[in-house]
């Protein structure tokens, strides 16, 4: 038996076409691997059967929902990861997990080639191929969409000519990627920056402009940086994301219309929905404001940004990311407590905080009676703090 091709299969246009195309052009057997990341929508058995219908000799579905939440989304929560201060890495977080399971499938099913359906314009080609090179440098990589310059029109035409079962049409050409952490929509009329998204773009969130009858108040509890409760009820990380997706999504929270800087050098417009992710990152960030010492918090904000950039750039398996996570793990020792948030009209508002690890001292902070702050020490502090600036200013004035 010749070496098999192990394909990262989403059930969408490009990877459905890829199964048939690889078989026709290379003569090799294709094993399709679909990863359940909590994306919802179609039943995964339907996706698996579609891969078989498209020509795969085997189709494997891996339930990786808890793994994704605990080993990929949780580090993003603890690093308050927002690329360009906005994008919660919806797609970027899932790619290294898919890579891991594709490598496992290659070992199990006799695959010498791994394949993906990424274009040459996107970030995912980098995330997949750098991941393969890191975990399994012996495997060859096939990227038919990129290497043979497929366009969406060509892919649709190929699918129609070969009776490939897909739902995409030329009139509805959105490219959609989704998982429990969020949903990403691109292409079509969204490529024109002035075009406003239409209702059919969204799925995880309700229209935030609707006059909702009442806000939703939610309390998120953390232990050492891990979300462990919603309104006092124990939850796993996956359950926390799922429950907040539903509650925040119902309030229109988590819609993002972003023009982002891609790794390949171009700018791209993306529409994201990440209700649960945005609530958890907001709550975790607020709890860190309460529990982290000032200089540690300042420095961690720098590492948070770098961690997000590394993940976005496909460097999940890099030594720097690993080192940053060791630092982040140390910072989470005291990040325990509860944050109360109000979800309403597309907005998240924090209105309560409590923690046994809090560095907020009421007696030091209050301006009422009982104030224990020694204000007599402030005059000397101000003088010493500004000494270098005053000396420099004195020199500059003397030189005029």
UniProtKB/Swiss-Prot annotation:
Main location: cytoplasm
Keyword entries, A-Z: Amino-acid biosynthesis, Arginine biosynthesis, ATP-binding, Cytoplasm, Ligase, Nucleotide-binding
Pfam families cross-referenced by the UniProt entry: Arginosuc_syn_C (PF20979), Arginosuc_synth (PF00764)
GO MF term (any one): argininosuccinate synthase activity
UniProt binding sites for L-aspartate: 119, 123-124
Binding site for L-citrulline: 87, 123, 127, 175, 260, 272
One Gene Ontology cellular component: cytoplasm
This enzyme's EC code(s): 6.3.4.5
Residues reported in the UniProt entry to bind ATP: 8-16, 117
UniProt-listed GO biological process terms: argininosuccinate metabolic process; L-arginine biosynthetic process; urea cycle
Pathway(s): Amino-acid biosynthesis; L-arginine biosynthesis; L-arginine from L-ornithine and carbamoyl phosphate: step 2/3
Catalytic reaction list: L-citrulline + L-aspartate + ATP = 2-(N(omega)-L-arginino)succinate + AMP + diphosphate + H(+)
Family: Belongs to the argininosuccinate synthase family. Type 1 subfamily.
Known partners and oligomeric status: Homotetramer.
Protein name per its UniProtKB record: Argininosuccinate synthase
Species of origin: Mycolicibacterium gilvum (strain PYR-GCK) (Mycobacterium gilvum (strain PYR-GCK))
Lineage: Bacteria, Bacillati, Actinomycetota, Actinomycetes, Mycobacteriales
The gene coding this protein: argG
């Amino acid at each position: 038996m010749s070496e098999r091709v192990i394909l990262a299969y989403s059930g969408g246009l490009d990877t459905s076409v890829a199964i048939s195309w690889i078989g026709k052009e290379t003569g090799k057997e294709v094993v399709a691997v679909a990863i359940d990341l909590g994306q919802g929508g179609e039943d995964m058995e339907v996706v698996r059967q579609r891969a078989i219908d498209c020509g795969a000799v085997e189709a494997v579905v891996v339930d990786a929902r808890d793994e994704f939440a605990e080993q990929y989304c949780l580090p993003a929560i603890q690093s308050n990861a927002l690329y360009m201060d906005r994008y919660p890495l919806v797609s970027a977080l899932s790619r290294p997990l898919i890579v891991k399971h594709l490598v496992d499938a290659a070992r199990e099913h006799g695959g010498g080639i791994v394949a993906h359906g990424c274009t040459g314009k996107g970030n995912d080609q980098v995330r997949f191929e750098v991941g393969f090179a890191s975990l399994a440098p012996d495997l060859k990589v096939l990227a038919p969409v990129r290497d043979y310059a497929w366009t969406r029109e060509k892919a649709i035409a190929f699918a129609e000519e070969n009776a490939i079962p897909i739902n995409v049409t030329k009139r509805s050409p959105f490219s959609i990627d989704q998982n429990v952490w969020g949903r990403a929509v691109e292409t079509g009329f969204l490529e024109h920056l002035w075009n406003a998204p239409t209702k059919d773009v969204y799925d995880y969130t309700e229209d935030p402009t609707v006059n909702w009858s009442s806000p939703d108040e939610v309390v998120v509890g953390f232990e050492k940086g891990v979300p462990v409760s919603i309104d006092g009820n124990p939850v796993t990380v996956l359950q926390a994301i799922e429950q907040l997706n539903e509650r925040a999504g119902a309030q229109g929270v988590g819609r993002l219309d972003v023009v982002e800087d891609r790794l390949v050098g171009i700018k791209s417009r993306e529409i994201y929905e990440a209700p649960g992710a945005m609530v958890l990152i907001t709550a975790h960030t607020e709890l860190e404001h309460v529990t982290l010492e000032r200089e540690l918090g300042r420095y961690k904000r720098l590492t948070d940004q770098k961690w997000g950039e590394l993940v976005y750039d496909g460097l999940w398996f890099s030594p720097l990311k690993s080192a940053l996570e060791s630092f982040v793990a140390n910072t989470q020792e005291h990040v325990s407590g509860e944050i109360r948030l109000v979800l309403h009209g597309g907005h998240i508002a924090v209105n309560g905080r409590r923690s046994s690890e809090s560095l907020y001292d009421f007696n030091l902070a209050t301006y009422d009676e009982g104030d224990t702050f020694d204000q007599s020490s402030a005059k000397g502090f101000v003088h010493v703090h500004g000494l270098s600036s005053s000396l420099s200013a004195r020199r500059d004035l003397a030189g005029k």
